[in-house]
């Protein structure tokens, strides 16, 4: 049966290609560009240059092509977030789980963005990054601090990840493929 399933999956991949478009947003130094690099190449670098404006990268995983918009997190770029989040398959909000000092700003920026009617119903994936660092929040603490339970107009999920160690990156990709707006 395994050979038959493999053959069917191969045939499906030839005829049923899926495309997704994602916006990666979050405050500066949360790890958005590192996430793009880990998803695209499996590689991680300690030396990241802050994103100025945005970068776009296409990545293919199996039969799914993912277009990733990596948006700058500095205050001067946050006004662009809404524009790049309209009509995407999902919004990926990256939070530095080891930086409690920025959580209130991060929560405020996320909730302000999601209050825009143009973004109603777009699935949200919140990623607590840098769980490899001491003092990183738990999933429950991050969910509470970010007020995620109050977001009821869309599908919301939270994963704790480490781009540095590639922790939970495969689960993130699986969730995105299964729950993105385009696959509903």
Swiss-Prot record:
Residues 1-18 dip into the membrane without crossing it. Pfam families: Arf. It is found in: Late endosome membrane; Lysosome membrane; Cytoplasm, Cytoskeleton, Spindle. Gene3D superfamilies: P-loop containing nucleotide triphosphate hydrolases. GTP binds at residues 29-34, 48-51, 70-74, 129-132. May play a role in lysosome motility. May play a role in chromosome segregation. (Microbial infection) Component of tomato mosaic virus (ToMV) RNA replication complexes. Required for tobamovirus multiplication, especially for efficient negative-strand RNA synthesis and viral RNA capping. Disruption phenotype: In double and triple mutants arl8a-1 arl8b-1 and arl8a-1 arl8b-1 arl8c-1, impaired multiplication of tomato mosaic virus (ToMV). Belongs to the small GTPase superfamily. Arf family. This is ADP-ribosylation factor-like protein 8b. The gene is ARL8B.
């Amino acid at each position: 049966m395994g050979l038959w399933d493999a053959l069917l999956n191969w045939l499906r991949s030839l005829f049923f290609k899926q495309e997704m478009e994602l916006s990666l947003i979050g405050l500066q130094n949360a790890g958005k560009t590192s996430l793009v690099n880990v998803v695209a190449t499996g590689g991680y670098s300690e030396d990241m240059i802050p994103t100025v404006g945005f970068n776009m990268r296409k990545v293919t995983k199996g039969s799914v092509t993912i277009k990733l918009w990596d948006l700058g997190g500095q205050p001067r770029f946050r006004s662009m977030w809404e524009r790049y989040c309209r009509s995407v398959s999902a919004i990926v909000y990256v939070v530095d789980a080891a930086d409690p000092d920025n959580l209130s700003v991060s929560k405020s920026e996320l909730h302000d963005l999601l209050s825009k009617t143009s973004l109603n119903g777009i699935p949200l994936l919140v990623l607590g990054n840098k769980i490899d660092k001491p003092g990183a929040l738990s999933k429950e603490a991050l969910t509470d601090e970010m007020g995620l339970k109050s977001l009821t107009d869309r599908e919301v999920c939270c994963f704790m990840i480490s781009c540095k160690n590639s922790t939970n990156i495969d689960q993130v990709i699986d969730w995105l493929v299964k729950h993105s707006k385009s696959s509903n």
